Amino acid sequence: MPWQAFRRFGQKLVRRRTLESGMAETRLARCLSTLDLVALGVGSTLGAGVYVLAGEVAKDKAGPSIVICFLVAALSSVLAGLCYAEFGARVPRSGSAYLYSYVTVGELWAFTTGWNLILSYVIGTASVARAWSSAFDNLIGNHISKTLQGSIALHVPHVLAEYPDFFALGLVLLLTGLLALGASESALVTKVFTGVNLLVLGFVMISGFVKGDVHNWKLTEEDYELAMAELNDTYSLGPLGSGGFVPFGFEGILRGAATCFYAFVGFDCIATTGEEAQNPQRSIPMGIVISLSVCFLAYFAVSSALTLMMPYYQLQPESPLPEAFLYIGWAPARYVVAVGSLCALSTSLLGSMFPMPRVIYAMAEDGLLFRVLARIHTGTRTPIIATVVSGIIAAFMAFLFKLTDLVDLMSIGTLLAYSLVSICVLILRYQPDQETKTGEEVELQEEAITTESEKLTLWGLFFPLNSIPTPLSGQIVYVCSSLLAVLLTALCLVLAQWSVPLLSGDLLWTAVVVLLLLLIIGIIVVIWRQPQSSTPLHFKVPALPLLPLMSIFVNIYLMMQMTAGTWARFGVWMLIGFAIYFGYGIQHSLEEIKSNQPSRKSRAKTVDLDPGTLYVHSV
């Protein structure tokens, strides 16, 4: 029957990952300590942002109030980081948001998440490699770019770069080889570079507070006119705004915070190390929280020092810190800062490249991507094929493409992953424990099963009979979370696209927003009234269900700020991914194979959310 075939097809799209009871066993080498994960998170997050982004945001968007921008951005990133930390404690396996989605919301969403994570890491790797090449070229007087532009220029504007970047190509291939040697070797390099980076940033902070002038946070129009009279190249001056500490108003802080949010992207690479961390359930949450805290303190202190050292409208976006030291008369210090920037970009590059092959490996091992990509090198115990293939693709993009137009595309993939992880945490916290004692396979969220004593009623939505999660209460939360995702998307769309009528008091749009808010609040109350799982974890997100929902709202709102061209490129990337999934992955998925082999199915077990049985390795 056509209906039955359609139903079976739909079940394939939402089937959830089932794992063997010994899921702590891994073919990868468990060699990463908590310090390694903190170094990886700080290195990948505290990269180009602190040396480039701070100058751009302070000059054009926020002025000295950039310190508030970083605070707002850090708070929004912490929301996502807390959700990642809880999932890292629940499911200590490679794959990051991909696996988290697979065990919770189903195969199609998991593939979508993993496919976009691959896009984010590839673009991030290529763009940082280009930035490293440019920073090194600037340090030696731009000889590389001048030579290549004069001899091998590319004449395809808005598509390709001005010239092929052989330096970036070689850099990515070199680091690909380093990652292929093993995680512990690359972790050592990351720790060294991150240490140098933090020392340089410490020097910048101390210098800024010693040589800084509080008057630069109180600039007036007279100061601006004086600067124009003193400078010959007044075209390099940024806008004054209204002067003072918040020269561009509250709107400038929000615009700056939206940009600064991307300076914290990168901590999620810690969540991909579940099969290589020595104690993943403890070290992954600690690594995420500590790395985000360190990065916020560094961003806050450096941006404060930078805006105290020189007027915000005179900052150079491309190289704000070296120019600031020139401004205060410490010219030799710019070389110290240059070394720090190269170390920061190096760790950021490793941070982008490290999770890329591991997400590919996790998807290939599950059969959603080509199985050859899951091959493990017997000597180094690293995903050698996935590492080499992803490195070559990233090197090719760094070699030919100018990636400034693709940054927003990278952000969509990252924000989508953050949102799905938050939804997964919300759903899992309200599910009953699913340890399978009879050997029968049980999905993480099963269909609503009611008994004579448990029926779905309006009273039961707000006053459930049980104090522990049941299949019915778990299904209620699953459905309510799906409805909330739709309603929050609609609310963010209205706020982003029709903000002017709302601010002007348009009754229609005001009524729409009020209605959406009432529905959202009502569903949140229903979720809040359901019993939560009491499974002990090393880390749990506080204030459920509010914190995950706040994270989802912020992420979706930022996605709504993307341009139509960015969404069009996103659509092309997703078409390629769906062609692979429906042409190969849906038929070769491990879950598909299990469903066709009853003998194996009888022995399969789902994810055991009890850490005592889930993870047996001890340090």
UniProtKB/Swiss-Prot annotation:
Gene Ontology biological process: amino acid transport; L-arginine import across plasma membrane; L-lysine import across plasma membrane; L-ornithine import across plasma membrane; transport across blood-brain barrier
Annotated TM spans: 37-57, 62-82, 108-128, 163-183, 192-212, 234-254, 286-306, 336-356, 383-403, 407-427, 476-496, 507-527, 541-561, 570-590
Q: Which residues carry this modification: Phosphoserine?
A: 618
One example of the protein's molecular function in GO is: L-ornithine transmembrane transporter activity
Impact reported for residue 356 to K = Found in a renal cell carcinoma sample; somatic mutation
Q: Residue positions of the PTM Phosphothreonine? A: 606
Superkingdom of this protein's organism: Eukaryota
Main localization is membrane
Q: Known catalysed reaction(s)?
A: L-arginine(in) = L-arginine(out); L-lysine(in) = L-lysine(out); L-ornithine(in) = L-ornithine(out)
Answer whether the UniProt record assigns the keyword Electron transport to this protein.
Answer: no
Q: Which UniProt keywords apply?
A: Amino-acid transport, Cell membrane, Glycoprotein, Membrane, Phosphoprotein, Transmembrane, Transmembrane helix, Transport
* Family the entry assigns: Belongs to the amino acid-polyamine-organocation (APC) superfamily. Cationic amino acid transporter (CAT) (TC 2.A.3.3) family.
Q: What is this protein called?
A: Cationic amino acid transporter 3
Which species is the source of this protein?
Homo sapiens (Human)
Q: Which gene encodes it?
A: SLC7A3
